[in-house]
């Protein structure tokens, strides 16, 4: 007897976090496909069924046009009558204001506002997606969620009973002058390292620039501290995992979050990326850089 296919359709507002969601499903062992045209799905099901090896699929479905939307609705109707496929819909949402903010930050164009106002495109998309949202088994509002928090919500809703998703580490740089990260599990202060801020050529740059990174890391104090911190994390990460945590946030801070913490976070994050799923984020890098450039 052919094993049924567990299908999750990831959809929702553009900019609400579908890319992060797809990565989370990959960590849960799903075969993920981004933006496959609905017209190709029957052939895709046929190939999956014939392979006999794929039992969990997550499809990211974006709204490109009214015609595309009609194809999606037809696809869902066909799935309702398909005994082989057990489907669920995950709808990701966020407030209009938050979506505008995210689009302005990334400078990308909204798919339904290529030649018009961003807000008009958002409102048009929201109206078109009303039926899909109403049909969704899971709706997640990502307005106030970090990528880590969204991942955890997906793990909570979609991991199989008794299964454990891949352990996830978020390494975050930050500036103490902008406050401690409230969701950090581990906070480390690297303000004792040499500060590139006082070197004129390095001041407008960041710890992502090779010359600044090397300035911060290429000294005995930095190397010694890195080795000890790495050893500590190597010892405690398996213990966090054994306790059932799905993720740990390591926050590394310097004064402004532009130079030292960025360089150190990059090195720590990359060091653990072979053993764990790792995200490296720099909370205050743009904020402090703008302040420096104005001074």
Curated annotation (Swiss-Prot):
Superkingdom of this protein's organism: Bacteria
Keyword Chloroplast on entry: no
Residues engaged in binding ATP: 12-19
Pfam family name, one: PapZ_C
Cross-referenced InterPro entries: P-loop_NTPase, RapZ-like, RapZ-like_N, RapZ_C
Keyword ATP-binding recorded: yes
SUPFAM superfamilies the record matches: P-loop containing nucleoside triphosphate hydrolases
Gene3D superfamilies attached to this UniProt entry: P-loop containing nucleotide triphosphate hydrolases
GO MF annotation, one: GTP binding
Chain sites annotated for binding GTP: 62-65
Keywords, alphabetical: ATP-binding, GTP-binding, Nucleotide-binding
NCBIfam families recorded: PRK05416.1 (NF003828)
Family: Belongs to the RapZ-like family.
Function, as annotated: Displays ATPase and GTPase activities.
UniProt protein name: Nucleotide-binding protein LSEI_0959
Record organism: Lacticaseibacillus paracasei (strain ATCC 334 / BCRC 17002 / CCUG 31169 / CIP 107868 / KCTC 3260 / NRRL B-441) (Lactobacillus paracasei)
Source species taxonomy: Bacteria, Bacillati, Bacillota, Bacilli, Lactobacillales
